[in-house]
Structures are given as C-alpha cells and as structure tokens.
Amino acid sequence: MPAPTGNCLLYLDIVPGHPVQIRKLAGVRRYAALRGWDVVGVPRREMDRTDVRDLLVRHRPVGVVVEGSGRRNAFPPQLFGRTPVSYVEYPAEETAGQAPNVSIDDDAIADAAFRELSLGRPAAFAVIGHRHPHLWSLLRVRAFRERCARAGADCIAFPVVPGESTERYEARLSAWIASLPPKTAVFAAGDSAGAAVSRGARSAGRHIPKDLTLCSTCDIPEVCEDAPTPVTSVHLDFERMGWLAAESLASGENASVGPLFVSRRRSTAGRGRREPWILQAVGIIRAEACGGLAIDELVVRLRSAKGRPVSRRNFDRRFREAMGHSANEEILSVRLESACALLAQTDMRVTAIHDFCGVGCYSNLDALFRSRFGMSMSKWRARNASRG
C-alpha cells in the first residue's frame, strides 16, 4: 500500500446532498483548512479492496475519514495500510483498538428527549426509528426504551419492516399513530421519522401537540420546520463530529458526541385543547425570551390579544397545567439553549454571551448555567465546541 505523500484528505463513503453528511463534511473541511489540506469527498457506491487501493494510489492522501452511518461497505482499518484512518458512526466493534471512531452518545440523547417529552406529563411513551433498520436508528430506539424502563414507563415501539413500499409504510404508520393512547409522547430516532409522524398524524386524525407530543433527533431545520407541525428535536453538532474525526487522524483518540440542547418547536408546545392562548404564549416565549421578555409583559400582550382580562396568577396556573412547568422555566430553557448554541458554534467571549440571551449579567447566567449543567460555561465549551 502506498505511503501518504499528497496534500489531501479523503472523506470516504458519503451521500452527496444528505443534510447530516453536509454538516460532517463542513467540519472535516474546517479542520483540514487549518492544516493546509484539500478534502476530496468520495460518494457512496459499491466498493471493494481494489477500489480502495486505486483511491490511495491516485490521491496518496494524508489520511482517510470513513463515514459509517447507513453504510453499505465494510472498510476495516487494515485496508488502508500505512495511511492514517478514522471513522464516524462506524460499528465500534469493527474498529476497536485499531483506529479512532467518533460516535454519538445515544444514552444522552435518550435522556434529553425523555426530559423534554416528560415536561408535558404524558400518559404514555412511544418510539419510532428510521424506516430502514440502520444500526444508528436501532441503537437510539433501544436507548430510549431503556430510559423509559428505568423511569418505570412502558414504551410502544413502531416495528420496522425492511423492504416495504412507501405506500405500505405510510399506511402502517398512520394506523399505528391512530392506535396510540391519548396524551402519548412520541420519540423519533431521526428527523425524517419525526416528520413522517407529523404527516401521519394528520391522516390518522390525531392532533400534535394537543393530543400527541413529538420529539425527534438531529435538528435539521429544513426537515423539522417543513413538517405539517414543526418538530422539536434534540440538537446534534454534526460539524463537530467531522472536525473530531479529522483531528483524530493525528491524535488517535476516540470521541463521543452528545446533544447540545433541544430545539423546541410546536410539536411539544403544550396540549390543552381549550387553551390556544397558551400555545400563543409559548410561541412568544420561544421567539423573544432572549430579547429580555418578562412574564408581566407577556401577560399584558395576551390580555390585549384575548380582549378580556388575564391575571398573572391565572396565567401561571393555566400555563403550568398545559405545559407541565412554569412560564419562567420555559423562558429559562430558551435562554440556556441559546447560550449553549453560542458557546458551541461561535467564538464569542463567555463573559459577553449573557447580552444575547436576555440575562442581565454574566454572573447570573453563569449561576443558572452551573445549576442546569453542573459545570461552568467555559468548561462546557471546552467539552462541546469545535476548536479552531
């Protein structure tokens, strides 16, 4: 096998245009740019040992990053000879002790989704994976079912039927949604499954979020926000995964990426059928909490919109009944989610972030952050932000 002599990095087995892999590729490119490398993406196709050797001879890359999500081919580390190789979402048992692997912490995802869905005090839980039995989906479904079991809650799983037609899948999904008990909280292993549930609920005659609540994973805006009911999603930093995979070519270290925060949308915005004004309040909070929105101001605006009195005490009580937590807690969650996004995705000074989260001063935000996450903002950034 030829020794690496070129100035490029190969990203192997990617699906062009896939929103998750676009983000991973961006992370690989960010790291490569710091090292002065070019990045060559190799689209997914049937490949054998000869194909891999031809790629290595042609490019003589400084390293290879192998995509493992939804893979069709096996790329064992020994296939690459003296060329450094790392993996992203590849089966851990196939790389253990031989090459670094960047994985997703499915238990942490399950915890985040369970907490979000539990806020609405559901009567039951359900889970759905990707329509195809990808390993990442099966692991995520299992993690959520185990999380429910630890809480003493049953979890209704949508069964996967490999190879079924789209028409059959949609009909079966609609029937499953129709059969769910009232006030069921549904977790989808990925955004595509979450969007499918959002569509299927309409044909099943079920209303999200008044009858069912829904949370998915990945937080791809073009998928979540285009669903009939926009879908709340656990945010994963795929760009950071790509960065870590490229970085691990030199460090040789495994890495695990957990969720940054939950992007809340209408699919978890309360469930009181006779309380549309509570849903309006949630929308205002999620849009304006980081602008310094106060509860008293919100109550005044709702009073004007309803055209009749809304007392602060009545608002607090009705909001908690519908959402399972107070309006102040909703505002705090939105502000902390914004802080996490700024810490992970920008180079903004930690001491300046409070100005963009609606919190009066750095010390107040730092205290709130430590209470929620058990660590300082600086430490959280060191663990979760892409460097460079």
Predicted regions: what they are:
Residues S263, E337, S378:
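Nucleotide phosphate-binding site architecture
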Residues M1-V65, G70-R301, R312, D316, ...:
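Bacterial carbohydrate/catabolite-sensing allosteric modules
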Residues E321-G360, R383-G388:
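Terminal helix-turn-helix DNA-binding modules in bacterial transcription factors
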Residues D296-E330, H354-K379:
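Basic/polar phosphate-binding segments, predominantly the helix-turn-helix DNA-binding elements
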Residues T268-G283, F356, S363-G388:
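…primarily DNA-binding HTH/wHTH and HhH modules…
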Residues P122, L336, G374:
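ATP/adenylate-binding site constellation spanning eukaryotic-like Ser/Thr protein kinases
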